[in-house]
Regions:
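Conserved beta-strand scaffold positions in the cores of enzyme catalytic domains, especially
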Residues: 126, 149-151
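Alpha/beta-hydrolase fold active-site neighborhood
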Residues: 1-108
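Catalytic active-site module of serine/aspartate enzymes centered on a nucleophile-bearing elbow/loop
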Residues: 153-168
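Extracellular/periplasmic catalytic domains that process cell-envelope and extracellular macromolecules
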Residues: 58-60, 117-120, 141-144
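The feature captures the conserved acid-bearing segment of alpha/beta-hydrolase catalytic domains
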Residues: 108-119
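Short beta-strand/loop motif that positions the catalytic acidic residue
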Residues: 120, 126-128
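Conserved alpha/beta-hydrolase "acid-adjacent" motif
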Residues: 77-78, 128, 133-138
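Short coil/turn segments at secondary-structure boundaries
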Residues: 138-140, 163-164
Length: 168
């Protein structure tokens, strides 16, 4: 249970921007406020079921691919030194419900995929959210292949083509 709480806490700031936006800042509980406010906020942003067996099993295919091909973000844990029980433990490899030792990370997979998309991908439309932290890894595309990349202003991980400005 303590590992689930620690990992959910580390996920909180990333998930806040992945699925929310700056308007959600007002909902952040004040320092020194009641613990229930923090629990409610975490439930709203991350979900209290985030580290449940059901969620871990549901996301296992993604976590496996993140651990072996996609990579993942690293949480900033410097401010938590001395209070964590699992420092640097929040990693996709720790979330997969089986031994990951036989499956190393291959850092070449995604650059190869992106290279193919840019060189050969035709009629591809990529829509990213301006505020989605995953957009820092946005693929490049080539207009000569009739492919385009757009960032939805103020958008998050749920950005979609209909929400793009009319000019795009």
């Amino acid at each position: 249970m303590d590992k689930a709480l620690e990992f959910s806490t580390l996920e909180l700031p990333f998930a806040f921007w992945q699925y929310g936006n700056a308007s959600g800042c007002d909902a952040i509980p004040p320092r020194g406020g009641p613990a229930q406010g923090l629990v409610d906020f975490m439930d709203e942003v991350v979900g209290l079921s985030y580290m449940s067996d059901g969620d871990l099993n549901y996301y296992a295919p993604y976590d496996f691919q993140a651990a072996t091909q996609l990579g993942s973000y690293a949480s900033d844990e410097a401010h938590l030194r001395g209070v964590q029980r699992y420092p640097r433990g929040y990693d996709p490899r720790a979330l997969v419900p089986f031994d990951m030792r036989p499956y190393p990370f291959n850092p070449f997979v995604m650059p190869i995929v992106e290279g193919w998309v840019k060189a050969f991908g035709e009629r591809i439309l990529l829509v990213y959210g301006e505020n989605d932290p995953w957009s820092t890894g946005a693929f490049s595309v080539s207009a000569r292949n009739d492919s385009y990349r757009f960032f939805q202003p103020g958008g998050n991980h749920g950005s979609y083509i209909q929400a793009l400005p009319e000019a795009d």
